[in-house]
């Protein structure tokens, strides 16, 4: 794995295209604007706007590291890339011979697509709020559709809230966050139908102090359970002696008396499918969102760990029932992308 905050511009686009074309023609694999069939390992680069320790990005990074350890990819990444620099870093990786570029396009949707259009022989797989475009065949999208696991954590949270006052703190009210909050709230209502919700967004993907201060305010306003969509929330919960629900990653090891349950996002099914398609030369404009769902192994409820045996049995019975129904297709968690509101 190579960490590459910035890449040299030593290889020009003309030289790169000539080299790639020659190699592909030699192998008999050149197919014009279609992403090339790749030999192992696939040169894969990731562009992240936040540190790799951040919840969401850490799951992509983890999957990429695992793929490199298997020998499937040769992985480089840039973290803390500003939105204004994002397209530039994408181009630098493209000019340096990378076959697959992954990352998050939420704040640079148009710019990312423009870069992909310039490099039709490279496969791009980026987190996005929008669907793929047929006229951009090398640009696929993904998202964290872990609403099933979020719903299950809500069932648990509702059963453990004495006050019925629950706080939810997120980064931005975008569909990727909104749907998880709504699913969590729906789960809460299963075991605590009269629950009240305080909802707030801190306007950042990585600002633990801001998340912590927002959590303090909610606790002061009566919340005894917090949905920690961002880092910092569980710190406040731990300090004030209230409970929290984790999102995307399992942080219970750091908060053993605070984090009751977590909805886990596994990026491996998404990345592995992209790797398979790049190898086969079949990568195309596609929505990979389904690979984040529980049925595909992209989401799961983390083990209760220190809270095993502390959740009411009735709630756990419902969790197991719903989990089985989700896996069989008999229950579908509603996907609501509208901004959630306090009530």
Place the predicted regions along the sequence by residue.
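Extracytoplasmic "Venus flytrap"
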Residues: 43-70, 76-86, 106, 173-179
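Periplasmic-binding protein-like
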Residues: 98-105, 125-127, 221-231, 247
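An alpha-beta-alpha
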Residues: 64, 150-195, 199, 287-309
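Short beta-strand elements at the ligand-binding edges of bilobed clamshell
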Residues: 133-156, 168-173, 256-269
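N-terminal secretory signal peptides
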Residues: 1-31
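C-terminal segment of N-terminal export signals and the immediately downstream linker at the start
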Residues: 10, 32-45
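Hinge/cleft segment of the Venus flytrap/periplasmic-binding protein
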Residues: 279-343
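Flexible loop/hinge segments that line or gate small-molecule binding clefts
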Residues: 117-143, 248-258
């Amino acid at each position: 794995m190579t960490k590459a905050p910035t890449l040299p511009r030593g290889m020009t686009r003309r030289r790169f295209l000539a080299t790639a074309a020659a190699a592909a023609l030699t192998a008999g694999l050149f197919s014009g604007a279609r992403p090339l069939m790749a030999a192992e390992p696939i040169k894969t680069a990731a562009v992240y706007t936040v540190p790799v320790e951040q919840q969401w990005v850490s799951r992509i990074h983890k999957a990429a590291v695992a793929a490199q350890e298997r020998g499937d990819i040769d992985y480089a990444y840039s973290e803390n890339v500003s939105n204004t620099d994002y397209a530039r870093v994408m181009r630098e990786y493209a000019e340096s011979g990378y076959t697959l570029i992954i990352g998050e396009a939420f704040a640079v949707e148009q710019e990312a697509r423009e870069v992909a259009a310039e490099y039709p022989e490279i496969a791009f797989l980026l987190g996005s709020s929008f669907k793929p475009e047929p006229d951009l065949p090398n640009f696929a999208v993904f998202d964290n559709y872990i609403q099933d696991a979020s719903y299950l954590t809500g069932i648990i949270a509702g059963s453990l809230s004495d006050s019925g006052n629950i706080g939810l703190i997120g980064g931005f009210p975008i569909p990727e966050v909104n749907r998880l909050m709504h699913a969590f709230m729906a789960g809460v209502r299963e075991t605590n139908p009269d629950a009240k919700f305080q909802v707030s967004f801190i306007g950042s993907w990585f600002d633990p102090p801001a998340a912590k201060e927002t959590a303090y305010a909610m606790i002061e306003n009566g919340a005894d359970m917090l949905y920690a969509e961002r880092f910092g929330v569980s710190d406040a919960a731990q300090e004030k002696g209230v409970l929290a629900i984790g999102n995307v990653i399992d942080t219970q090891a750091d908060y053993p008396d605070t984090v009751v349950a977590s909805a886990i996002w596994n990026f491996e099914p998404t990345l592995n499918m992209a790797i398979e398609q790049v190898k086969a030369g079949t990568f195309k404009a596609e929505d990979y969102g389904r690979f984040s769902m529980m049925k595909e192994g992209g989401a799961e409820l983390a083990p209760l760990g220190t809270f095993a045996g502390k959740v009411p049995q009735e709630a756990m019975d419902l969790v197991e029932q719903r989990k089985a129904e989700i896996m069989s297709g008999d229950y579908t968690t509603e996907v609501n992308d509208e901004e959630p509101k306090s009530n």
